[in-house]
From Swiss-Prot:
Entries under Pfam families matching the protein: Usp (PF00582)
Keywords recorded for this protein, A-Z: Cytoplasm
InterPro entries per record: UspA
Taxonomic lineage from the root: Bacteria, Pseudomonadati, Pseudomonadota, Gammaproteobacteria, Enterobacterales
Name of this protein: Universal stress protein E
Entry keyword Cytoplasm: yes
Superkingdom assignment: Bacteria
Keyword Cytoplasm: yes
Family: Belongs to the universal stress protein A family.
Function (record text): Required for resistance to DNA-damaging agents.
GO cellular component, one term: cytoplasm
Localization (cell): Cytoplasm
């Protein structure tokens, strides 16, 4: 039995084609498990009208939920008839990301899949406010699915942070690699690559310190990263040819290598902080995500505290 046995798929209400559902079925066919197709809907006009009694408004909401449930059933019919176990749940909620996270917590889902919309001309993925809320706050891994089939001979690229002094990063690196290898083992033996980017010498240092040698600095930084990468790959028996230590900004290096390797998915860690430090899902991670042209799997560290309460009953669920 593989990892990710209890999958939640966030249904896109605006189109019949559901890439996230397709990807979930692809995983279940190779990895086992079950799927729940989930949709949170809301229409302010149903709550604004004063011409309807509370009972009538409730009945109208339930009618809309019933219609949407039937629509999702039609999208799932082929998969269900093929033997894929899919449950369907539609709820009335004015904040989709909260409804999704509450469902993750309530039903203990271990993976969330959601479609990511693609910019037509740039090929990069466009993330909505709901997407960002989920990436920051959802306690289980979040797989953002591009509207493309898995590439032929596609790889998985794991972005690890080997330069941070943040104590959360070392165990998070281990978790990223471990979970990706476990998943890849069950999904067509997908090759797993590791990538770490290291910074170039700040120009102002060379100007302010005449005796400073940028080449010595760069060699030292690269050496530190190579040693750390070797230690990481050896823990998992990964061949050196599958590891990459590249000079430059992560938001440039990681998407470029993903494209070069024909990556089907980039796996990275999100610390999911809130408040002021939310600027660092962290700043670097958000820039990387914005530049990707493939699927994204974002994983939180162990012990992550979800800021959303999970014990609310979903209103008017079906």
């Amino acid at each position: 039995m593989g990892k990710y046995q209890n999958i939640l798929v966030a249904i896109d209400p605006n189109q019949d084609d559901q890439p996230a559902l397709r990807r979930a079925v692809y995983l279940v066919q190779r990895n086992g498990g079950t799927i729940k197709a989930f949709l949170a809907i809301y229409d302010l006009s149903y709550d604004m009208t004063t011409l309807l009694s509370p009972d009538e408004r409730t009945a109208m909401r339930k009618g809309v939920i019933s219609q949407r449930s039937a629509w999702i059933s039609e999208q799932c019919r082929f998969y269900i008839d093929s033997g894929i176990p899919i449950d369907i749940k539609v709820v009335w909620h004015n904040r989709p990301y909260e409804a999704i996270i509450q469902e993750v917590l309530k039903a203990k889902h271990d993976l969330l899949l959601k479609m990511a919309h693609q910019h037509d001309r740039l090929e990069s993925i466009i993330f909505t406010p709901t997407d960002w809320h989920l990436l920051r706050k959802c306690p289980c891994p979040v797989w953002m699915v591009k509207d493309q089939p898995w590439p032929e001979e596609g790889t998985a690229l794991v972005a690890v942070n080997l330069s941070s002094e943040d104590p959360l990063h070392d165990p998070l690196n281990l978790r990223l690699v471990k979970e990706t290898l476990e998943l890849a083992e069950h999904v067509n033996q997908t090759p797993v690559h590791l990538i770490s980017a290291y910074p170039v010498t700040p120009i102002n240092i060379a100007i302010e310190l005449p005796d400073f040698d940028p080449s010595v600095y760069n060699d030292a930084i690269r050496g530190q990263h190579l040693v750390a990468m070797k230690a990481l790959r050896q823990q998992f028996g990964i061949d050196e040819k599958f590891t990459h230590v590249e000079k430059g900004l992560p938001e440039e290096v990681i998407p470029d290598l993903a494209e070069h390797l024909n990556a089907g998915v980039v796996v990275l860690g999100t610390l999911g902080r809130t408040g002021l430090s939310a600027a660092f899902i962290g700043n670097t991670t958000e820039h990387v995500i914005d530049n990707l042209k493939c699927d994204l799997l974002a994983i939180k560290p162990e012990g992550f505290t979800c800021p959303i309460e999970g014990n609310e009953d979903q209103e008017d669920a079906e």
